[in-house]
């Protein structure tokens, strides 16, 4: 089943109980290279880490968070915020490292909860209310997702009692839709605003970014 729907379809009854959030983070040195026109490499790493901190901080008020990453700096920051941390087992040169990391975290968490949420780690303008509303809407379906503000990417993927089947990467919204996930249509601008480009960051700042991101940007003006 695929398509684009607002909440309201009958639940299959598998969506009860707590959900767990997965955030997959690549090495900070390799992250957000499209921000290079506005930040030096060192500053870019600081901003990426700050966006992760703000994302974890917001998400953890809604559900427990596990970060899967090969990066020790990101892992330490996540631990300091009370998030679980899983070392990314993905081998170097893997053809699909992001989705492999997510599936490793899913396998790790499934013993504790059948309900999994995947969030991007670069949602500095996301409000806890937005994630809570999206999570409530997602419980209507076995699998669903929230597209990014451009309509091509995926900010969040939800699976209740079924495998995640992540399809993150280029044109992930289309791939998730074709895989049977339902696209949620709520107005959640912060949740939809993941950061890849300078324009994305400007949009997030207009919405209002979290304190860590605001401080990281202000320190390098």
From Swiss-Prot:
The regions listed as transmembrane in this protein's record are none
Q: Name one GO molecular function term.
A: phospholactate guanylyltransferase activity
Result of knocking out the encoding gene: Cells lacking this gene accumulate 7,8-didemethyl-8-hydroxy-5-deazariboflavin (Fo) to five times the wild-type levels but do not produce F420. They are also unable to decolorize triphenylmethane dye, and are sensitive to oxidative stress caused by the redox-cycling agents plumbagin and menadione.
Catalytic activity, reaction form = phosphoenolpyruvate + GTP + H(+) = enolpyruvoyl-2-diphospho-5'-guanosine + diphosphate
Q: Which InterPro entries match?
A: CofC, Nucleotide-diphossugar_trans
The biological process GO terms on file are: F420-0 metabolic process
| Pfam families per record | CofC
Query: What EC number is given for this enzyme?
Result: 2.7.7.105
Highest taxon above the source species: Bacteria
Tell me, in a sentence or two, what this protein's role is.
Guanylyltransferase that catalyzes the activation of phosphoenolpyruvate (PEP) as enolpyruvoyl-2-diphospho-5'-guanosine, via the condensation of PEP with GTP. It is involved in the biosynthesis of coenzyme F420, a hydride carrier cofactor.
Query: What protein name is recorded for this chain?
Result: Phosphoenolpyruvate guanylyltransferase
Species this protein is from: Mycolicibacterium smegmatis (strain ATCC 700084 / mc(2)155)
